Amino acid sequence: MNLIYFAFKYRYRFKDLNNFLKSRIYGNYILLNFSGPFKYYLSKILILLKIGRAISCDGQPMIRNKSQGYNFFIRGTDLNIPTNLLDLDNNIVAIKHPLLENNKIFQIYPINIKKTKMNDDIKIIFMSSIKLETNEEESLFWETHKEKILSNFAILDDKYFWQNNLANKNLFQINRFYRISKSLLRFEIVTYLKKIYDKKFVLIGEDWRKYWIDSLESNFDTKKNKIIYKGNICLDTGSLEGSSSLYPRANQIIESGGLIVQSYAFDASEHWKDLKQDLLFKNFDELRNIIDKLINNLELSNILLDKIYKHFKNSSISMEETLNRYFSK
């Protein structure tokens, strides 16, 4: 049995790891949670004594080599790895990016999923932050390409779109345009849904109060979030950092028993298989068509929720494959 353990001090990453943070056995691996302000010191002793291998979050503490474990950047891509850690060969990330090779992905799957039913009074839930600060060049880029982007949201994950339109920019500069464009698209999607569904659309995040005063305050309590997601349609416009179907927010929705409706991601075919056509959207028409079918048909919503449960109920096997990729050597 191979020992693997989480080794990080601060609790704010707990919500990003979701059910994967819980101690359990995956095949030949026993995964223990030694994170948090007290257990963290036990993990430091184990690292010092070279017992097992650690997974740290954001390089805190820094794991120096693969024999000790990995530095896991759960909220980002290779572009989020700090410069002082770039030379290490044991950095792994959670999110794919259309402009990168994506050969350091540590894929986490939704596990221990609740088998639930849809609420009788279905709501559309969306939790996120929003920041729309742009400079003149970024605003011009958005206005120039807005019509094309709104007709096909997935174009933002086409590397040739960026290479053709920002050929004079380096990777980090392009990534800033990428993040801003995804934020502006998120705003357009929310605006569209608020107009159509009004009180049925529950918007959560203090940043949104600049635009809609009925937006609810941000909630960082994982247990409360799970209650909110459970049995409702849960909108997921994807990570601003990159394009992955199964990243922290999506996993939390699925594990909570929420019926996820997701913007088409870079790896959608790999993870969603035949469920793509029922849950994923690339434009406003597809989004509205999906939501209209679900919000007005409790039976269909329950059928799809059950399909999601069955699709991921054996994800512990997939999780073992992820661990094998990095810890079998």
Role assignments for model-derived ranges:
Residues M1-N28, L42-R53, K194-Y197:
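N-terminal subdomain of nucleotide-sugar transferases
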Residues Y5-F8, R13-D16, N33-S35, D78, ...:
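Nucleotide-sugar donor-binding catalytic core of glycosyltransferases
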Residues R13, F38, Y178-L185, E286, ...:
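Soluble or luminal CAZymes and related metallo-dependent hydrolases
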Residues Y26-N33, K50-L79, T83, D87-H97, ...:
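Active-site proximal beta-strand in glycosyltransferases
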Residues I254-E255:
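Short alpha-helix at the nucleotide-sugar/activated-sugar donor binding site of glycosyltransferases
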Residues D274-F281:
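A short acidic/histidine/glycine-rich donor-binding loop in glycosyltransferase catalytic cores
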Residues K282-L300:
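C-terminal "capping" alpha-helix adjacent to the active site of nucleotide-linked donor transferases
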Residues I295-K329:
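A charged, aromatic-enriched C-terminal amphipathic alpha-helix characteristic of glycosyltransferases
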